């Protein structure tokens, strides 16, 4: 525990590059392009990549306030998982169940598409497709797992995608405490997100795209992005700003920036790894409501995250001091040791935080207004590593007017209502988190589903 205070306050993923993270020049005065993309994370880079792959003649400009990978794309848990936040049922309500399941299957396939691009572009980001394992550590969690498997079978999803694990099988994957059962989800991989986002940026440049960093976009209107450093004129403008959407004029209530924190251990020995499992490097968590997440890195560290406190700052503020809050990282460490007590004496070398973005309807999506030429993609609720690829591919098809199967998926055209003004946003987050935390505590203590607490949390989430 003492090592936590001495850990580097920096993302593990961005701490090993020999080159400068700030290697690209800012915008230098007005410029005209075909497509301007605001945001140098996964969403913006994948959009640019597929645009240029399909039409190399396009003039594509990415505008990044800091450097590529500064935001969630360089700070996340490295879960490249073929799943979307929000749930199939919500997408079915705005289309049909068949279409919602088509979106689900397309997400399953997206992990392999990402691997294809990484291989073809020679991007070494420690990609390893070891699946995802969620262990149930109390009876309500186990019951939810069984219900999830039953529902998957009813909808035609087979064991090659998702299957139940008994207690022994689950412990063989993740040797956690109090394991009742588990779920194995095959279309999931681990990545080093920093290597992935930096490699993707270079791939975009090789294809002819231009990236300006240290460039602050202030506002978007038809055909124009106003930046501190100059005005960008463009036929199409794509907003890919995720947790930093509040920085764009008039967009403060579009997405809620919520904090997540991570820690990374020192590299483990072979004997330590044998004690905790994770032999095939699956991503892992348990079935609690306040999400935790982890992976074993290619150099045998455990990178582990969770929400901590506070999850949200009044007025949608983003504060780097909060990202490195020691108390929040202590909560993450306690969750890790509660799950895997074998690691209680292992040193923590890095601790960091970042923001994820939540739309009011909790549904990720994308849209392109043909009249104004302005598009948006994101709102991934913390599950954007793989989803951003599908969103970027789809946005490219919309811009190029390609009649692909992607442009009719039911997350295309999703538009959430805006978040409530303060203090309602702040109160809503605090109440929702308190009820979910109470549900986790109650279920562990009583071994019964916390129905009332979760009903209130679902109402606040708009479920």
Question: What annotation goes with each model-predicted range?
Answer:
Residues 83-167:
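Dinucleotide-binding Rossmann-like beta1-alpha1 core, especially the glycine-rich loop
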Residues 39-45, 65:
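Glycine-rich Rossmann-fold phosphate-binding loop(s) that bind the pyrophosphate
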Residues 143, 150-155, 177-235:
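Helical element adjacent to the flavin cofactor pocket in flavoenzyme catalytic cores
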Residues 52-75:
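Glycine-rich FAD pyrophosphate-binding loop
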Residues 1-35, 53-59, 458-462:
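Extreme N-terminal leader/targeting segments of oxidoreductases
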Residues 52, 387-409:
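Internal hydrophobic alpha-helix adjacent to the cofactor/substrate pocket in enzyme cavities
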Residues 321, 339-342, 359-364, 375, ...:
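Helix-rich C-terminal "cap"/substrate-channel and partner-interaction subdomain
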Residues 120-128, 219, 231-271, 275-372, ...:
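Active-site substrate-recognition segment that forms the wall
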């Amino acid at each position: 525990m003492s090592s936590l205070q001495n850990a580097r306050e920096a993302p593990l993923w961005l701490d090993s590059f020999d080159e400068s993270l700030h290697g690209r020049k800012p915008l230098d005065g007005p410029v005209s392009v075909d497509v301007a993309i605001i945001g140098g994370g996964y969403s913006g880079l994948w959009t640019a990549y597929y645009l240029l792959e399909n039409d190399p003649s396009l003039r594509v400009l990415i505008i990044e306030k800091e450097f590529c990978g500064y935001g969630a794309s360089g700070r996340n848990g490295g879960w490249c998982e073929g799943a979307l936040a929000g749930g199939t049922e919500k997408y079915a309500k705005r289309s049909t169940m068949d279409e919602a399941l088509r979106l689900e299957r397309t997400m399953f396939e997206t992990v392999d598409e990402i691997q294809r691009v990484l291989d073809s572009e020679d991007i070494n980001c420690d990609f390893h497709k070891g699946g995802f394992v969620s262990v149930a550590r109390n009876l309500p969690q186990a019951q939810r797992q069984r219900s999830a498997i039953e529902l998957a079978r009813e909808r035609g999803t087979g064991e090659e995608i998702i299957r139940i694990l008994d207690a022994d099988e689950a412990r063989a994957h993740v040797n956690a405490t109090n394991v009742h059962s588990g779920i194995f989800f095959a279309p999931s991989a681990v990545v080093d997100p920093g290597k992935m986002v930096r490699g993707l940026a270079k791939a975009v440049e090789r294809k002819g795209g231009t990236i300006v960093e240290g460039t602050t976009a202030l506002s978007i209107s038809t055909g124009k992005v106003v930046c501190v450093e100059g005005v960008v004129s463009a036929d199409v403008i794509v907003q890919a700003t995720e947790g930093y959407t509040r920085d764009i004029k008039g967009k403060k209530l579009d997405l809620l920036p919520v904090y997540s924190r991570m820690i990374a251990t020192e590299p483990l020995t072979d004997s330590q790894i044998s004690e905790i499992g994770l032999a095939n490097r699956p991503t892992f968590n348990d079935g609690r409501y306040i999400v935790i997440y982890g992976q074993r890195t290619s150099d045998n560290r455990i990178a582990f995250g969770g929400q901590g406190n506070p999850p949200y700052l009044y007025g949608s503020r983003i504060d780097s001091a909060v990202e490195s809050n020691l108390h929040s990282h202590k909560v993450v460490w306690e969750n890790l040791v509660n799950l895997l007590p074998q690691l209680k004496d292992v040193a923590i070398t890095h601790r960091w935080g970042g923001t994820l973005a939540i739309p009011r309807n909790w549904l990720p999506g994308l849209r392109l207004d043909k009249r104004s030429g302005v598009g948006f993609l994101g709102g991934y609720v913390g599950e954007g590593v793989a989803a951003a690829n599908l969103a970027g591919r789809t946005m490219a098809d919309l811009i190029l007017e390609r009649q692909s199967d992607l442009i009719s998926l039911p997350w295309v055209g999703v538009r959430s209502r805006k978040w409530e003004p303060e203090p309602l946003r702040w109160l809503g987050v605090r109440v929702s988190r308190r009820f979910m935390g109470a549900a986790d505590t109650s279920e562990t203590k009583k071994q019964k589903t916390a129905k009332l607490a979760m009903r209130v949390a679902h109402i606040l989430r708009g479920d």
